[in-house]
Amino acid sequence: MAQLPPKIPTMATAWPEFGGGHHHHAAHGHHHQRSPSMGAFLAAPLPPFPLPPPAPANGGAQQQQQQQQHQPSWVDEFLDFSATKRGAHRRSVSDSVAFLDPVSDDNAGVGAHDFDRLDDDQLMSMFSDDLQPPPPQQQPAAPAASASSPSDHNSMNDEKQDKGETDEAQSECDGATPGQPASPATVDPKRVKRILANRQSAQRSRVRKLQYISELERSVTSLQTEVSALSPRVAFLDHQRSLLTLGNSHLKQRIAALAQDKIFKDGGTEEGDREAAANLPPAKPQERGIPTGGRGPGPRPRQCRPDRQRGGRRGRAMPALVIGRDPDAL
C-alpha cells in the first residue's frame, strides 16, 4: 500500500506559532491540548537535503531560522512525514506509536513543546491510514466514525490500550508459578507454602495409591497362577468324590438288603426252634441229684406212675423194696 502524506487537521492553524504553541494550548484548555498539531512532525529528524554552505558560528542559528520561515509549509510537511516513516518501526497494528529516532540538536527546540503534549492516541489518529480496515459489522458506521472528532478516536484507542494492558496482566498472573510469585506484595508466602505442602502431600498420596494398586495387581496375578495350577487337581478330586459318592450309595443299598435278609433268617430260625421244641419229648425228673439219663450202682428203679395207675398192691410193696435195698440206712 502506498504511503500518502498525512491529512491536514481541520483547525485554525497558526503556522508561525509552532515554537510558541505551548502558551496557545495552555490558554485554550484541555480540548486544544489533545488536538493534533504540526509540531509533532517538526520534532522528528529531517532527512538530508541540499543545504547552503555553512555560515560563521555566530550567525548560523539566525540564518537557519530564516531559511525555515521562507520554506513552503507543504515541503516541510512532506519531508517530515517521510523522515518519520523511515525512522518509525511498528511491530503490529495494536502498537501505540512508532519508535522514533533521537531528535537532532538542531531541531530539538523547534516543536518540542507541542510534541511532548501529544499522546500516543493522537499520533495513532494521525496515522489512521496505515491501520487495517474495520471488520464487516462496523463498515456501515464507517462514515460516522470518519466524521467524528479526534477525541472520539482517542477514547476508542484508550479503551483498546486499557484492554490490552488488562489481558497482558492477566496472562502474566496466569503464567506465574506458585514457587516464583509475580510480586511479593500480592502473594502471601504462607499461602504459597501451604499450596506447596498440599501439592506434595497429594503427590505422595498418589504414589502410595499407585504402589498399593501395583501390589494388588501382583497378588491377583499370583493367585490367578495358583488357580490355573490347582484347577486340574480340583477337577480330578471332584471326579473322585463323585465316584466315591456313587460307590457309597451302592454300599448303603447292599447293607439295607443284607439287613432285610438277616431279619428274614432270624424269623425263620425262631419258628424252626419253636417247631423243634414242640416235637421233642418232655424232660424226665431227677432223683437225688442223679440225672435221669444216668444209671446208679443198684438195680434200676421202677417208675412210680405206672404203679399208681395199675393198682395198689404193687404200690404198697414199693416201700419194702426200698427198705430192703438199703438195710444199713436203718
From Swiss-Prot:
Record keyword Transcription regulation present: yes
Q: Give start-end positions of Low complexity composition bias.
A: 57-72, 139-151
Under SUPFAM superfamilies, the record lists:
Leucine zipper domain
User: Boundaries of each bZIP domain copy?
Assistant: 188-244
The organism's superkingdom is given as Eukaryota
Q: Which InterPro entries does UniProt cross-reference here?
A: bZIP (IPR004827), bZIP_RF2 (IPR044759), bZIP_sf (IPR046347), bZIP_transcription_regulators (IPR052483)
- Gene3D superfamilies membership: 1.20.5.170
Q: Name one Pfam family in it.
A: bZIP_1
> Does the keyword ATP-binding belong to this entry?
no
Q: What induces it?
A: Down-regulated by dehydration and salt stress.
**What is the protein's given name?**
Basic leucine zipper 2
User: Lineage of the source organism?
Assistant: Eukaryota, Viridiplantae, Streptophyta, Embryophyta, Tracheophyta
